[in-house]
């Protein structure tokens, strides 16, 4: 069987980009069990309720749902268990300082295979207020209307 190359996205967290301002983005490895990897190869995962936290110098990913592997036996995993993120100590310490001092949170943005290994894209996030969300929605609608008007003008 040939070795996988490239990036294959399994799941993305579009809700996080709607609910938060993303300040910094980083790629981390994920420590998984065998049945979790098999379930991910089937393309099944949900990042919607996911978040990461730092505990005793280690970063953990929680709230991410990876359903049980259908052909799994008694060795199957728990769908919402804590999963350890694989980062260097300096990176964890730097993010811990930012989270502690300014009240930011760490959210998963995407889960993907990179050259056969499971990676998660995590972001340092600051919560949006309702008026920020409405403003972003209004900007998106205005941009869409302008593009539509330009394409109509081009068609004439």
UniProtKB/Swiss-Prot annotation:
Localization: Cytoplasm
Functional summary from the UniProt entry: Required for rescue of stalled ribosomes mediated by trans-translation. Binds to transfer-messenger RNA (tmRNA), required for stable association of tmRNA with ribosomes. tmRNA and SmpB together mimic tRNA shape, replacing the anticodon stem-loop with SmpB. tmRNA is encoded by the ssrA gene; the 2 termini fold to resemble tRNA(Ala) and it encodes a 'tag peptide', a short internal open reading frame. During trans-translation Ala-aminoacylated tmRNA acts like a tRNA, entering the A-site of stalled ribosomes, displacing the stalled mRNA.
Keyword field contains Cytoplasm: yes
Gene3D superfamilies, per the entry: 2.40.280.10
InterPro entries: SmpB, SsrA-bd_prot, SsrA-bd_prot_CS
Gene from which the chain derives: smpB
Organism: Kineococcus radiotolerans (strain ATCC BAA-149 / DSM 14245 / SRS30216)
Cellular compartments per GO CC: cytosol
Gene Ontology terms for molecular function: RNA binding
Protein name, entry field: SsrA-binding protein
Region (Disordered) residue spans: 135-156
GO terms for biological process, alphabetical: trans-translation
Pfam family, one: SmpB
UniProt cross-references to HAMAP family, sorted A to Z: SmpB
Record keywords: Cytoplasm, RNA-binding
Similarity comment: family membership: Belongs to the SmpB family.
């Amino acid at each position: 069987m040939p070795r996988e190359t490239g990036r294959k996205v399994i799941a993305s967290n579009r809700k996080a980009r709607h609910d938060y301002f993303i300040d910094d983005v980083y790629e981390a490895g994920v420590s998984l069990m065998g049945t979790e990897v098999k379930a991910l190869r089937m393309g099944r995962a949900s990042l919607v309720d996911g978040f990461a936290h730092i505990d005793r110098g280690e970063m953990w990913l929680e709230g991410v749902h990876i359903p049980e592997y259908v052909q799994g036996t008694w060795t199957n995993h728990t769908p919402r268990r804590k999963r350890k993120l694989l980062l260097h100590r300096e990176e964890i310490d730097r993010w811990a300082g930012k989270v502690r001092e300014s009240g930011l949170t760490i959210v998963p943005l995407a889960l993907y295979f990179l050259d056969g290994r499971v990676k998660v894209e995590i972001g340092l996030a600051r919560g949006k207020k309702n008026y920020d969300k409405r403003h972003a929605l209004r900007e998106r609608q205005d941009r869409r209307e302008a593009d539509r008007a330009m394409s109509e003008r081009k068609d004439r």
